[in-house]
C-alpha cells in the first residue's frame, strides 16, 4: 500500500497547514497520520520524515515480491495536492510547503535503467472535466500560479522522462489529462483519474450522480510500466448484479500512455 492524503482526511475538510507560514495547527499535524491512522505501517524510513513535513514523500518499491535485488522498481512520488484546494490555512503565496520545489528536485534525481516513477496524488491539476471554467487548484493566487508551475514541471522533457504515469482521483469522474511540451506539442506526461466508489458528485454545489466504480491497473512487472486498466462499474439503476466494463484497452486506445 502507498497512502496518499485526500481532501476529506482532515476535519474540517480541505484544511492542510503550511509549515512555511507557521501559525497554530501545524506542529505535529502530519505526525498524527503516522501515529493515530497507522500510516507508519506503510510509510517507513526516510519517507516517514518527509511525510512529517507536509504530507508528501517518495518511496521506492520492487515491482514484485522477490529476494532478488535486480528486480525492476517503481519510485512512488506521493504529493499532498490538497494544499491547493479550498485550503483555509494561511499559505505561502508561491509554493506552499515547498512542495513544488521538492517535486522538481525529486524528479531531477538520476534513475537507474530499471526504475520508473509513478506520481500519485488526490486533487488533480487542470480544470474540472464538466466545467472548463473551474480550475481544481484554486489556492493560493486562485490556483493559477500553482497550476502553471506544476504543469511546467511535467512539460519538461528531462524532468518527465522517467515518469511512467500520474494517478489522481477527487473529481469523481473517469477522465484524464495530458501535459504537452510547450514547443513541440509532444505529450510528455499523462494523468489518469479514476472515478469514485461513492455516487456523490457536485457541480457548483448542485448535487449530481455518478455510477460507483473501481479501477484496476495492470502493469508489466519486468519493466515497471503500466500497461492497461479495467474499469468496474455498478450502475445505480441496475436491479441486479455488477456490470464489468473494460473500456480502455491497448487494443482499443492504441497506447496507454498517449491517447
Regions found by a protein language model. Give the residues of each.
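Extended active-site neighborhood of metal-dependent phosphoesterases/phosphodiesterases
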Residues: 1-105, 187-191
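Short, flexible loop/turn elements at secondary-structure junctions
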Residues: 5, 9, 63, 80-83, ...
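Short catalytic/ligand-binding loop motif for oxyanion handling, primarily in non-cytosolic enzymes
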Residues: 9-14, 85-87, 126-129, 174-177, ...
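Short amphipathic alpha-helical interaction elements and helix-loop-helix interfaces
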Residues: 14, 65, 85, 109-113, ...
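Short, glycine/acidic-rich beta->alpha junctions
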Residues: 51, 142-146, 209-211
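Residue-level detector of short, conserved catalytic/binding motifs and their immediate flanks
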Residues: 57, 117, 164, 212-215
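His/acidic metal-ligating clusters that form di-metal
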Residues: 69-71, 75-78, 89-192
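Binuclear metal-dependent phosphoesterase catalytic core
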Residues: 181-259
